């Protein structure tokens, strides 16, 4: 399970001084990633990775003043769940309700307007992946490879098992539940009873990282990024490969230097699918054929979003960048967000983006020019997952277990 945290520190390590130092540190981390659980690392938590004074970002006075003068985002409500020590949870809005979960095994259904608890299920499992929702089902995963399915009333539907840790939310569409494990295997399960229909395993490089990235499903296809910079389209019903393309080619001498995993969710619109690799490139492809539309240098472990005109990437060192979605041409780039570790992005109403950070702030950004519009704190916990849609705004979940809803009306 220690591998879960490896991805989160790679961008720190690769800026840790000399090449020799980077290789030594990463070599140690790779060895540690084989440990059975975090206790083998001395009980480390995800939050420990961001607490080093060496990694604190130096922000000039003008930047501090600019951030402090931003208007706050209107708070809607907040609830408290258990702290996440080794897992990252994403709230999900589905069929008029919000579902949240925590590492201690709780699944909670909330009223998205008031935050009122509608029901709570104690799964008695250590959850590691969730929440997924669709087709009247709520889906969770565990470190033991269990996939848990509930109906919208909180009743257990079925329980299945896959060989590996389920570190991302299971996805469902067209009667299939797609599960991804930490070692990048994909499984298609029958949504009725959880029985396995198909499985897929990509050929991966000798050195990879485990991450909490899931899959995207649209138009009968499953899109998934893999270690080595590969983007693959699978048939949802059969698991057969439709096409496989390269987002980013590995480069360098050592396996450490050649690591270029796609560690974030591919994004899809009507005509194209795009992905970005860590320490590599971003690229967009035709959704049906896989033919490349454009590619450019970029690096992100938190991913991208797309609208009618642009793709937006949450890049390294606290940078958000916009590129023309047809050509990849740079449109704008925004830094100085008070943090060098950002969450994934989300598009919200009013031509805006929302992004979280490792200091527990959420920031609204103008999609047209990258200007900062508003900013609010949460509980100071790290925000790693992207925000989730609400009818009147959005909601985020921090590693401290805080679930915070904000209004955009």
Swiss-Prot record:
List the InterPro entries hit by this protein, alphabetically: BamB, PQQ_b-propeller_rpt, PQQ_rpt_dom, Quinoprotein_ADH-like_sf, WD40/YVTN_repeat-like_dom_sf
Its membrane topology, per UniProt?
Lipid-anchor
On whether DNA damage is a keyword of this UniProt record, the answer is no
- Any one Gene Ontology biological process term? Gram-negative-bacterium-type cell outer membrane assembly
User: What is the annotated signal peptide range for this record?
Assistant: 1-34
Q: Which domain of life is it from?
A: Bacteria
Where's it found, cell-wise? Answer: Cell outer membrane
State the coiled-coil residue ranges: none
What's in the keyword line of the UniProt record?
Cell outer membrane, Lipoprotein, Membrane, Palmitate, Signal
**Where is this chain primarily localised?**
membrane
Which cellular components does GO assign to this protein? cell outer membrane
What are the lipidation residues for N-palmitoyl cysteine? 35
List the S-diacylglycerol cysteine lipid attachment residues: 35
What is the similarity comment for this entry?
Answer: Belongs to the BamB family.
Quote the function comment for this protein.
Part of the outer membrane protein assembly complex, which is involved in assembly and insertion of beta-barrel proteins into the outer membrane.
Q: Subunit structure of this entry?
A: Part of the Bam complex.
Q: What is this protein called?
A: Outer membrane protein assembly factor BamB
Q: List the top taxonomic levels of the source.
A: Bacteria, Pseudomonadati, Pseudomonadota, Betaproteobacteria, Nitrosomonadales
Task: Name the gene for this chain.
Answer: bamB
């Amino acid at each position: 399970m220690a591998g879960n945290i490896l991805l989160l520190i790679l961008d720190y390590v690769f800026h840790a001084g000399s090449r020799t130092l980077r290789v030594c540190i990463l070599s140690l981390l790779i060895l540690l990633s084989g440990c059975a659980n975090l206790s083998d690392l001395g009980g480390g938590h995800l939050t420990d990775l961001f607490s080093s004074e060496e990694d604190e970002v130096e922000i000039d006075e003008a930047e501090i003043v600019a951030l402090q003068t931003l208007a706050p985002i209107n708070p809607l409500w907040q609830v408290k769940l258990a702290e996440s020590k080794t897992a990252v949870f994403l709230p999900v809005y589905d069929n008029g309700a919000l579902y949240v979960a925590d590492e201690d095994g709780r699944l909670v259904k909330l009223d998205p307007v008031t935050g009122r608890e509608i029901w709570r299920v104690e799964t008695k499992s250590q959850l590691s992946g969730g929440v997924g929702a669709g087709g009247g089902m709520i889906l969770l995963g565990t470190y033991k490879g269990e996939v848990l399915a509930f109906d919208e009333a909180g009743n257990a539907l079925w329980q299945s098992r896959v060989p590996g840790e389920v570190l991302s939310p299971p996805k469902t569409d067209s009667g299939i539940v797609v599960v991804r494990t930490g070692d990048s295997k994909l499984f298609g399960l029958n949504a009725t009873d959880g029985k396995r229909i198909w499985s897929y395993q990509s050929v991966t490089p000798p050195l990879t990282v485990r991450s909490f990235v899931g899959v995207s499903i649209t138009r009968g296809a499953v899109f998934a990024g893999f270690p080595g910079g590969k983007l693959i389209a699978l048939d949802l019903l059969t698991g057969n490969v439709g096409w496989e393309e390269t987002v980013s080619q590995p480069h360098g001498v050592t396996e450490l230097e050649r690591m270029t995993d796609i560690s974030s969710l591919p994004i899809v619109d009507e005509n194209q699918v795009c992905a970005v690799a860590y320490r590599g490139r971003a690229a967009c492809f035709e959704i049906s054929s896989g033919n490349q539309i454009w590619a450019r240098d970029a690096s992100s472990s938190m991913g991208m979003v797309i609208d009618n005109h642009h793709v937006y990437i949450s890049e390294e060192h606290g940078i958000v960048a916009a590129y023309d979605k047809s050509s990849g041409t740079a449109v704008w780039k925004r830094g100085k967000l008070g943090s060098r570790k950002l969450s994934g992005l989300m598009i919200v109403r009013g031509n805006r983006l929302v992004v979280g950070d490792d200091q527990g702030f959420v920031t609204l950004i103008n999609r047209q020019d990258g200007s900062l519009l508003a900013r609010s704190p949460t509980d100071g916990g790290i925000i790693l997952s992207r925000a989730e849609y609400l009818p009147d705004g959005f909601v985020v979940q921090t590693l401290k277990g805080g679930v915070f809803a904000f209004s955009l009306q």
